[in-house]
Each structure stands twice: as structure tokens, then as C-alpha cells.
Amino acid sequence: MPRYRKLQKGEIMIMLYKILTALVCLAVMVLAPIFVKEQRGGPCWRSLFVKMVAATGYMAAGGLCVAMTGVCSPFDKWMLLGLFGSWIGDLFLHLWQTKVFPAIGFLGFLSAHFFFIAAYWTGIRAMAPDRAFFTWPEIAFVALFDVFFVIFAVKTGLNLKGVIAVPIVIYATVITTMLCKAAVLGITAVQTGAAHGAFVLICALAGALLFVASDFTISILMFNEKQKKNYPLKMFNIVTYFAAELLLAFLIALI
């Protein structure tokens, strides 16, 4: 007869946290398409409720990942701030009562990207203390990405004339920097033999790439009049966005 070891209280709690995290993630991804359906006729209180429940879900996933490890490291704190910045962005970007709200939402997402960059850099320095913040290949990549974004904006007919063009280009630069740091974090984790290195690479890079895909599509939805009611594009945008947030939340349990 096989003998089974009795699980300790700590092990049971970790298992419970993992189950709860899986259920939360499932709920978020189920709510994502429901949100798109609810706001098909335009933003409303019901669509806002669904969106914010889903957004609270990725915040909860981050908190559960902290509970799994039992430690809230500097990396974890930056990541939680990033998730909270995204939550603020989700809230205000969807409010429609005044034009000030979308601007606050934009700043919320911009701050979230800065927090994620700070988290990645904290993780990188913990594994490779001598690494420079930027290397020349990274600078070249960011510059080329900005050029690509300008070409993309022209080709897709984005209305970025006037003052709005400056913050959008800044945002593109920041999210490209986040993508760079995510890649470096994952590669450094693998190179240094860090625990869960391969999973860190997958979650960090996939999360950042999905974030970029989501931001590209939302720029089309917001600044191209012909695409504002493109339902499949809206679905792609919101699914990639929430998937990105969840993948980034998972990093808290891995680093």
C-alpha cells in the first residue's frame, strides 16, 4: 500500500492560493468578451462594472502570487504598483462623462508602464548587478520601434495631428522600453540559472508583447474613425490586454 505524506498547513495554503489564482484568471478571461459585448453600443455603467471586476481580477492575481511566496519583495511592490496603475487606467479610460477622464486613464497606463520598467530593472539588477540600464542595441531597438510606429500611424490612418501626437509618441517609447526590459529580464533569468528562469522569460516576454499588441489595436480603435466600431478588433484588443496583465501578475510568484 502506498504511504501518503500528510500535507503541512503551509503547503495546503499554497495549493489553495494556486487554485484561487487559476479561478480568478479563468473569470477574468471569461469576462473580457462579455465586456466587449456590453459596451458594443458605447460605454455604459454595466460595461464599466464588468470591466472593473475583470481589472480587479488581475489585481487579485497579483496579490495571490505574493501570498504564495510569503514575501513582498521590491520587485513585487513595483509590479503591484504597475497593476494598480493599469486598474486606474481601466477605470478612467472607460468613463465618458468628461474629456478629463480619458486623460487620467492615459496617465494611469503610462505610470503603470514606468512601474513595470522599474520592476524589471529591479529584477535584472538582483541577478546581474553590473548590467547597464541601456545597451546600444536596446537604444537602437527603441528608436527603430518609434520610427515603425510613425509609419504604422500613417498607414493605418490614425488621427494624431496636433498636441496629441507628442504624448502618443512618448507612450510608444515607454512601452517599447518596457518590452526591452521584459526581454532582458527573461534572458538574464535564464542565463544566470535563476529559479523558474524559462517561465520568467515566457511570462515577461509574452506579457509585454501582448501589451504592445493591445496598445497598437487600441490606438487604431481610438484614433481611426473608420475602426471605432470594429467589433473583432475590440475583442482582440481586450483579450490580449487582460492576458498580458495576468502574465505580468504571474511574474510575482516566479521572481
Explain the meaning of each model-derived region.
Residues 14-255:
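Polytopic alpha-helical membrane-helix bundles and their juxtamembrane interface segments
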Residues 1-14:
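Short, Lys/Arg-enriched N-terminal segments with co-localized hydrophobic residues
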